[in-house]
Curated annotation (Swiss-Prot):
Residues 64-201 form the N-terminal Ras-GEF domain. PANTHER family: GUANINE NUCLEOTIDE EXCHANGE FACTOR, RAL GUANINE NUCLEOTIDE DISSOCIATION STIMULATOR-LIKE 3. One of its GO terms (molecular function) is guanyl-nucleotide exchange factor activity. The gene is Rgl3. Transmembrane segments: none annotated. This is Ral guanine nucleotide dissociation stimulator-like 3. CDD domains: RA_RGL3, RasGEF, REM. Residues 248-503 form the Ras-GEF domain. Interacts with GTP-bound forms of RIT1, HRAS and MRAS. Coiled coil: none annotated. GO terms for biological process: small GTPase-mediated signal transduction.
Length: 709
């Protein structure tokens, strides 16, 4: 293909071409368009530099690129060692990062490691290291296996943790000792085994000390204990040292950022996979995703501190309580300056929760400037366009730091962070796992799904690398005050809030608190659906994502509103903001393209109804808060089947399905009862968000086993 200069066609460098099947494996085929330079011949005379003429042509070379899309496990492992790294550089990192979603580590090693022959003992006085000639005799596949194992050990060392013996790591260590003795990979395996054993010994020592010095067990108090509530109402938060808000805004924000950074750096990306994270509340799954659970606990601790400090001591005057609200707004602003979006989101969620939001007299005493800051910060996490604002800002923060780095500058000169709100990525992965099948026709592993998961995990890892640039020192007094801050349960928060400002019967506009103060923020999906491909055409058009209706979008932008009059709370960024805890299913995903199989190439978005299906969220009314589960609702689904599937996802015995009723949650605190025999798809309100609630019928008294933990 040739075109004159200045008339170059604006063609994409990589164009989808179709699929190929080879030995039971499915490959996606693309055409890569690469430019090659060609100048005019040299002028007469040797040694002269060629000068391009004005009519120089642009030459392009088109090459065929194949990427494995689906295959059986044996073929995937074979691709690890024999695949073309230049054509498909993302295969190995994607497989290593996501393999635990479809196969255990031991089985992969069973395919990957050939049984090594016993090496002959070296003669006395002869170095056992390989000579250069022996290295050259290594087979290509053997070198590839060693390379894959080296990447695996460096990037995913926790995959080999299997206490107490760490058998998988032992097998790798033996193989590398035979295949690459003295090499970097063998040394990595040795060091990792030493670290695991040392860590286990340290944990055992700490456990022995704890058992030796721990006193009698404390009596656990229920969250709704009247004793705890009386203490909160009469005495307020009690601690021997200073309270958290006694410290400066900068100090508190920096310590919150320090804790968030440490926890985020420990997050194992594979624990964020939707197939793993969605199993966390099942019986016997308490140990799943511990590093992600730690970030959830920290988020909930911060929201609890805000609630406890603002609602404590009901006898405070409205002006005094307003000062506490203002200080938390300034702390949130400082977190934004530190690029800590995790604590920023936690503080805003607490201030927007109903127990604090309903305090009109306290909000009326807040100064105009903090209110303006609060509105601007709240816009970051606005529900508009499926939380597109927070995603755009996070991407802008990442891009800014790359652009601000001059050529040749040291990485230490780059700004640290940002610390993301992990819930966004968790929900992206959960919804991706829900939307795309694990296997395709012929029981082939859908590796295209794993590639899309890897794109999200890779971004998490990039953010972790950037967060290593933070240089913050711990302040033990502030950390102690944070731990000592009294935590209020959701029921306590609401009761104390009503003591501070009793609900006025003559004020119907006062927001009515729901008991469903959720443990989960909105779970919604924005998956870009691909257009039906024509023969020889592109199977998908990522440039045309489908828009999604975001449940609970604000009617108007807070930045355009006038400050509220005295005695009114500030405008909330959304009509529903009761959540005070980090979602376990987290935040809505953003618009990323998803390639689907021809049989399922059109997946409805959460809150968006197609002619045949819709993704809905179903929660269950219990004492654990709202734990939402996503369900694909088709036009054939009747209420009993939807109730049964929802109970199954909430780990409630299915024989109890007849004891439950399904309600659609409508705007304005209204609910729509779905009759038992009705077709849910047609009985629901299509204009309302796809949020549903399961509630026990009157006269039934089963105890639910579902838990948000």
């Amino acid at each position: 293909m040739e075109r004159t200069a200045g008339k170059e066609l604006a063609l994409a460098p990589l164009q989808d071409w179709g699929e190929e099947t080879e030995d039971g494996a499915v490959y996606s085929v693309s055409l890569r368009r690469q430019r090659s330079q060609r100048s005019t011949p040299e002028r007469s005379g040797e040694g002269q530099t060629p000068i391009p003429a004005t009519d120089t042509f642009l030459h392009y070379r088109t090459s065929k690129v194949r990427a494995l899309r689906a295959a059986r496990l044996e073929r995937l492992v074979h691709e690890l060692v024999s695949g073309d790294r230049e054509q498909d550089p993302g295969f190995v990192p994607a497989f290593l990062a996501t393999h635990r979603a479809f196969v255990p580590t031991a089985r992969v090693l069973g395919f990957l490691l050939p049984p090594p022959p016993p090496p002959p003992p070296p003669p006395a006085g002869v170095d056992s290291k390989r000579t250069e000639g022996q290295d050259l005799n290594f087979s290509k596949n053997l070198r590839a296996v060693v390379s894959v194992l080296g990447s695996w050990l460096r990037n995913h060392p926790q995959d080999f943790r299997d206490p107490p013996d760490h058998q998988n790591l032992g097998n790798v260590r033996i193989f590398l000792g035979w295949a690459a003795p003295g090499g970097a990979e063998a040394r990595e395996a040795e060091k990792l085994l030493e670290d695991f054993l040392k860590e286990a010994k340290g944990e055992q020592t700490e456990e022995e000390k704890r058992l030796a010095w721990s006193g009698p067990p404390r009596i656990a108090q229920t969250p709704g204990s009247e004793f705890a509530e009386d203490c909160v109402e009469e005495e307020g938060p009690s601690s021997e040292g200073p309270e958290l808000l006694d410290f400066s805004v900068d100090d508190v924000a920096e310590q919150l950022t320090l804790m968030d950074v440490e926890l985020f750096l420990r997050v194992r990306s594979c624990e964020c996979l939707g197939s793993m994270w969605s199993q966390r509340d099942r019986p016997g799954a308490a140990g799943i995703s511990p590093t992600v659970r730690a970030t959830v606990a920290q988020f909930n601790t911060v929201t609890g501190c805000v609630l406890g400090s603002v609602l404590a001591a009901p006898g405070l005057a409205a002006s005094q309580r307003a000062q506490r609200i203002e200080k938390w707004i300034r702390i949130a602003q400082r977190c934004r300056e530190l690029r800590n979006f995790s604590s920023l989101r936690a503080i805003l969620s607490a201030l927007q929760s109903n127990p604090i939001y309903r305090l009109k007299r306290s909000w009326g005493a807040v100064s105009r400037e903090p209110l303006s800051v609060f509105r601007k910060l709240s816009q970051i996490f606005s529900d508009e366009d499926n939380h597109l604002s927070s995603r755009a800002i996070l991407s802008q923060e990442e891009t800014t730091e790359d652009d601000d780095c001059p050529s040749g500058s040291l990485p230490s000169k780059l700004p640290p962070g940002p610390v993301p709100y992990l819930g966004t990525f968790l929900t992206d992965l959960v919804m991706l796992d829900t939307a795309l099948p694990d296997t395709l026709k012929g029981n082939l592993i859908n590796f295209e799904k794993r590639r899309k998961e890897w794109e999200i995990l890779a971004r998490i890892q990039q953010l972790q690398q950037r967060c290593q640039r933070y240089s913050l020192s711990p302040r033990p007094p502030i950390l102690a005050a944070l731990r000592a801050q009294r935590q209020l349960s959701e029921e306590q928060s609401y009761r104390v809030s009503r003591v501070i400002e009793p609900p006025a019967a003559s004020c119907p506009s006062s927001p009515r608190i729901r008991r469903r103060i959720s443990l989960t923020k909105r779970l919604s999906a924005k998956l870009s659906r691909e257009k039906n491909s024509s023969p020889g055409g592109s199977p998908g058009d990522p440039s045309s994502p489908t828009s999604s209706v975001s449940p609970g979008s604000p009617p108007s932008s807070p930045r355009n509103r006038e400050p509220p009059p005295p005695g009114s709370p500030p405008a909330s960024p959304g009509p529903q903001s009761p959540s005070t805890k980090l979602s376990l299913t987290m935040d809505p995903p953003g618009p990323w393209p998803v390639t689907l199989t021809p049989s399922s190439s059109r997946v409805p978005l959460l809150g968006q109804q197609t002619s045949e299906a819709r993704v809905i969220r179903v929660s269950i009314n219990n004492n654990h808060g709202n734990l939402y589960r996503s369900i694909l609702l088709t036009c054939q689904d009747k209420a009993p089947s939807v109730v049964q599937r929802a109970l199954e996802k909430h780990n409630v015995p299915q024989p109890w399905a007849r004891d439950y009723q399904l309600f659609q949650v409508l705007p304005g605190d209204r609910e729509l009862l779905i009759p038992d025999g009705a077709n849910v798809f047609y009985a629901m309100s299509p204009a309302a968000p796809g949020d549903f609630l399961l509630r026990r019928k009157e006269g039934t008294g089963h105890t639910l086993s579902a838990s948000p933990t």
